[in-house]
UniProtKB/Swiss-Prot annotation:
Signal sequence extent: 1-20
Gene Ontology, cellular component aspect: endoplasmic reticulum; extracellular region
Cell compartments where the protein resides: Secreted; Endoplasmic reticulum
Oligomer and partners: Interacts with isoform 1 and isoform 3 of MAD1L1. Interacts with MTTP.
Tissue: Highly expressed in the intestinal epithelial cells (at protein level). Abundantly expressed in the epithelial cells of the liver, kidney and cervix. Significantly down-regulated in hepatocellular carcinoma and right colon adenocarcinoma compared with the respective adjacent normal tissues. Expressed in epididymis (at protein level).
Name of the protein described by the UniProt record: Proline-rich acidic protein 1
Pfam families: PRAP
Gene: PRAP1
Organism (species): Homo sapiens
Amino acid sequence: MRRLLLVTSLVVVLLWEAGAVPAPKVPIKMQVKHWPSEQDPEKAWGARVVEPPEKDDQLVVLFPVQKPKLLTTEEKPRGQGRGPILPGTKAWMETEDTLGHVLSPEPDHDSLYHPPPEEDQGEERPRLWVMPNHQVLLGPEEDQDHIYHPQ
């Protein structure tokens, strides 16, 4: 099987080199430069530059720009309430609270399966020792060497 594949590949390569198999040609219309050169950044980024909305009077009239206030973690003295709640802030805070329990470490449930260490138990309690089962022998023990040492 390998020989057949090898021979077929060699025949195809030889025919291609000899010119018997026509090489695939791309029409001239299809030869398009896909990547812009590094020396022409205007073409790469586009010739038109969009100005920010503050400088464009038409957009400011349609969409008034409100600069959002930054939320700070500083505590305000009593008597001063919270400032105005920006639109979307409440939803953001609810999302943060919702994800808080997911992002926190999982609770420790080891005490359900393992007793606390002796230092944490406080007073010392008597230890319960498990006694092995004792077999009371009456008379001499039977010789069982033949089980472990076959002859």
